[in-house]
C-alpha cells in the first residue's frame, strides 16, 4: 500500500491548492495596493483643493474693495421707519469689483421674503444677485447694482409670515446716510515668481596655499657684565639653560674677571719707569700661567661630564634592531606553525 503523499492524485490536489493559495494571495496584494493608491490619490486631491480654495478666495477679495455704509428703510411717502428695517442687518456695505459698484446687505428671516426689487431715482430696476443663502441661519446676502452718487433706493417687497397669516406687498424707500462714495481700485496682486536658487559654483583658487612652516624660536643668550669700568675690555659669559654647564661658565667667569682686574690695574697705574713695567709684565705672565692651569683643570673636569652625557643618550639604533629581530622571529614561528598544521591535516586526510 502506497503512502498518501506518494499518490499522484494527492500530489495534484496539493499542487492545485497551492496554486489557489498563491492566486488568492496575489489578488489580495494587488487589490490592497490599488485601494491604498486610490486613497492616497484622494488625499492628494483633497489637499490640492484645500490649498487652492484660499488662493482663489484671496484672489477674489483682492480684486474687490469695500466700505461700510449705514442706511434706514422708511415708509413710502414719509420719513417714518418701516418694519422692513428690522429685517435687514446694519450697516450695509459698498463694494467695487471689476469696476462695478454694489450695495450689499443681509436679509434676516429670508424665508419671509418672497420677492424683493430695488429701483433707482429714475424708477429703473436694479440688478440683484444672491451672494450667500444660509438655510440654517435663515439669512440671505444680496448685492444690488448701484452707482456712485446714489442717495436712496425704492424697494418693492412681498412678505409672507405663515405663523401669523401675514401676506402683504408694499413699497418702501431705503435712505443712505451718505451718497454712494467712489472707491479706489483694488491693488492687483503682484505675481512674484519664486526665486530659483542658483547652484553654488566652486571658487577658483586665486592663491596657492603655502605649507605652514613651523616657527623656530631663537634662544637669546643672557649676557652678564663684570663691572661698569669694562667699556673697552668687556667680558661676556653666555649662560645656558642646563645646570650641568653652569660650573663651566662659573670657572670661565672667575678666570676672566681676574684678567680684567689685572688689566684695570695696568690702566690705572701710570708707567713711571721700566722696572715697574717689567714687574707688571712678570705679574701678568704669572697670572696667565695660573689662568691656563685653571682652564686645564676645568677642561679636565668637563670631560667626565661629557662622557656621562654620552652614556645617557638613548639607544635608538639598538631598539630598532631588536624590534626587527623580534618581528622576524615571530613571523618565522607563525610560518612554521601553519606548515605543521597543514602537514597534520594532510596526514589525517590520508
Curated annotation (Swiss-Prot):
Keyword Transcription applies: no
Keywords from the named record: Cell wall, Heme, Iron, Metal-binding, Peptidoglycan-anchor, Secreted, Signal
Region listing for Disordered, in residue ranges: 188-314
Domain of life the protein comes from: Bacteria
Biased composition (Low complexity): 203-214
Binding site for heme: 75, 82, 166
Comment field on protein domains: The NEAT domain is responsible for binding Fe(3+) and Fe(2+) heme and fibrinogen. The NEAT domain is an inhibitor of apolactoferrin activity, while the C-domain confers resistance to bovine lactoferricin.
Protein name as catalogued: Iron-regulated surface determinant protein A
Amino acid at each position: 500500500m502506497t503512502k498518501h503523499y506518494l499518490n499522484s492524485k494527492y500530489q495534484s490536489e496539493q499542487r492545485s491548492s497551492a496554486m489557489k493559495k498563491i492566486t488568492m494571495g496575489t489578488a489580495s496584494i494587488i487589490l490592497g495596493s490599488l485601494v491604498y493608491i486610490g486613497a492616497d490619490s484622494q488625499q492628494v486631491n483633497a489637499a490640492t483643493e484645500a490649498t487652492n480654495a484660499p488662493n482663489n478666495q484671496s484672489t477674489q477679495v483682492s480684486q474687490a474693495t469695500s466700505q461700510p455704509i449705514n442706511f434706514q428703510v422708511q415708509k413710502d411717502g414719509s420719513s417714518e421707519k418701516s418694519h422692513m428695517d428690522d429685517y435687514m442687518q446694519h450697516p450695509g456695505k459698498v463694494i467695487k469689483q471689476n469696476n462695478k459698484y454694489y450695495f450689499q446687505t443681509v436679509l434676516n428671516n429670508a424665508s419671509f421674503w418672497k420677492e424683493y426689487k430695488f429701483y433707482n431715482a429714475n424708477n429703473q430696476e436694479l440688478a440683484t444677485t444672491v451672494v450667500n443663502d444660509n438655510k440654517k441661519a435663515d439669512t440671505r446676502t444680496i448685492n444690488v447694482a448701484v452707482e456712485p452718487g446714489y442717495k436712496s433706493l425704492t424697494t418693492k417687497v412681498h412678505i409672507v409670515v405663515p405663523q401669523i397669516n401675514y401676506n402683504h406687498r408694499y413699497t418702501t424707500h431705503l435712505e443712505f446716510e451718505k451718497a454712494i462714495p467712489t472707491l479706489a481700485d483694488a491693488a492687483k496682486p503682484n505675481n512674484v515668481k519664486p526665486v530659483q536658487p542658483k547652484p553654488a559654483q566652486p571658487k577658483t583658487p586665486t592663491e596657492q596655499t603655502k605649507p605652514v612652516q613651523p616657527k623656530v624660536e631663537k634662544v637669546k643668550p643672557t649676557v652678564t657684565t663684570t663691572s661698569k669700568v669694562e667699556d673697552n675690555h668687556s667680558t661676556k659669559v653666555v649662560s645656558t639653560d642646563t645646570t650641568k654647564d653652569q660650573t663651566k661658565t662659573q670657572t670661565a667667569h672667575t678666570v676672566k674677571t681676574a684678567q680684567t682686574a689685572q688689566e684695570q690695574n695696568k690702566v690705572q697705574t701710570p708707567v713711571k719707569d721700566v722696572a715697574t713695567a717689567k714687574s707688571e709684565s712678570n705679574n701678568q705672565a704669572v697670572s696667565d700661567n695660573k689662568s691656563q692651569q685653571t682652564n686645564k683643570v676645568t677642561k679636565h673636569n668637563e670631560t667626565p661630564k661629557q662622557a656621562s652625557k654620552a652614556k645617557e643618550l638613548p639607544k635608538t639604533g639598538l631598539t630598532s634592531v631588536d624590534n626587527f629581530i623580534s618581528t622576524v622571529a615571530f613571523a618565522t614561528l607563525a610560518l612554521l606553525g601553519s606548515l605543521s598544521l597543514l602537514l597534520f591535516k594532510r596526514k589525517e586526510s590520508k
